[in-house]
């Protein structure tokens, strides 16, 4: 079975070669999320980070992150990625109108910005 890449929640798919071509030509929107659990006073008690294997096989911490799909709001993308990466018991409370604390641009060219993604030009709302 060929791996395919989802681009919207209605079931449209791009073949991997087509997605690679799109990534070469278009900036892709992403969300970077740092989910936290707070106590009744609003103090942070827990931070939701992921453990992933790096390219050299080491286990590293990573933030929840992923693409925004076609016809998906930023809020929906945040909730989807938190549930996908941290599980349904994460039960995120996402603000009605989330506001990013920063915007990061990832470029395929090293040194073009502090952020590098060799696959694409990505714009990430953090």
Q: Each predicted region: which residue ranges?
A:
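Generic secondary-structure boundary/loop-capping signal
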Residues: 19, 23-25, 60, 65, ...
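A generic structural signal for short beta-strands and their flanking turns/coil linkers
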Residues: 29-31, 57-59, 64, 94-99, ...
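Short regulatory "switch" loops immediately downstream of catalytic or recognition motifs
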Residues: 34-40, 83, 87, 104-108
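Short N-terminal secondary-structure initiator segments
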Residues: 1-11, 75-99
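Active-site segment of metal-dependent pyrophosphate-handling enzymes
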Residues: 87-126
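Acidic, metal-coordinating catalytic segment for phosphate/diphosphate chemistry
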Residues: 1-41, 114-124
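Conserved Nudix-box catalytic region and its N-terminal flanking loop in Nudix hydrolases
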Residues: 42-91
